A protein has these predicted regions:
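Alpha-helical interface subdomain recognition
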Residues: 2-69
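Glycine-rich flavin
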Residues: 37, 41-44, 51-124
Length: 124
């Protein structure tokens, strides 16, 4: 994350500015089956993955509605980009239950990105 994290408004502005680029790259992204590394890196540098991350690790702690507007705007360019950013954003949710030292260790490397899934672990 960054020392001065972009706000949700900053990310929304950048997402809007990048819609056409994302649309133009969508077919190549789909064919590759993954985000191009330069795109993943720039999304990280622009603060997208840290929208819900705690501020003590450089996250924006954005309200859910603001983050979802960012995701919606990215999806207007390329839904797969929006999906990847959404996974990165939601993967930061459990960080609030970790100690400050653990969070700092996870984000010791600039541009750290998380990915994961939530699934029910109980039985009915």
């Amino acid at each position: 994350m960054t020392a001065n994290p972009p706000s949700a408004e900053d990310c929304l502005r950048v997402a809007s500015e990048r819609r056409e680029e994302l649309y133009d790259r969508a077919a190549a992204t789909e064919a590759a089956g993954r985000l191009p590394e330069d795109l993943a890196e720039s999304l990280s540098a622009e603060g997208f993955y840290g929208l819900w991350a705690p501020s003590d690790v450089g996250g924006a702690e954005a309200p859910a509605a603001d983050a979802m507007r960012v995701i919606e705007t990215l999806a207007e360019g390329d839904a797969s980009v929006a999906w990847c950013v959404f996974i990165g954003i939601t993967s930061t949710l459990p960080l609030s239950s970790l100690s400050e030292n653990a969070r700092r260790e996870i984000f010791a490397s600039p541009g750290a990105r998380l990915a994961g899934v939530f699934e029910p672990s109980g039985t009915a």
